[in-house]
């Protein structure tokens, strides 16, 4: 039987961060690596994730505990905590497939989000596309980014978004592409977006337009 080489998942763990690339088509998709897993471990993982997704949808993410997930999945607490050390780890795992969908659109989808548009236009399209993604699962992304200090920067998905933004900014000739990528992604943090949408009651479409304009400003080349 193949050895179970998977470890516990949490929002503070590194999740297959993309390697440095030189071409947009080389950007790796999160989660494409082959991971060997025992059949019983795989079944338990699927049961846990299905239970977590169901409970999060029914009660909201803050209203669900790890004990609730273990009970709903029919697994022992030890089994749950060996694989997912906290709710942040559950959030990261649940988001994986959804994030890969957006990543695939970036890699091979139609322009302006995918290849074929000018770099500045692609950057603005990424902002709009990511905001739409974020709006659909804001609580999950918020949990995955804030469950432990620095959790957001350690996820493979964040590494992918940063590499993509940095690449496009480099292509536009913008100065300090690393810093500008970080500035743009800081505005797209789930906690910040939640504040704008739920505390300040900003309209999502208006916010997308404003942040896309900010992306275009960041993409301006050296004078």
Role assignments for model-derived ranges:
Residues 1-59, 63-72, 89-92:
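Basic, helix-initiating cap at the start of DNA-binding domains
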Residues 38, 45-46, 66, 88, ...:
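Short, structured helix-loop boundary elements
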Residues 74-84:
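Short hydrophobic/aromatic patch on the recognition helix
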Residues 91-98, 137, 141:
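Alpha-helical DNA-contacting segments of helix-turn-helix folds
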Residues 93, 107-136:
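Hydrophobic alpha-helical connector segments
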Residues 103, 121, 125, 132-136, ...:
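Amphipathic alpha-helical packing segments from all-alpha helical-bundle domains
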Residues 107-111, 142-151:
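Short linear capping/connector segments at secondary-structure termini
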Residues 130, 144, 184-188, 215:
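Short alpha-helical scaffolding segments that buttress acidic/His motifs in well-ordered protein cores
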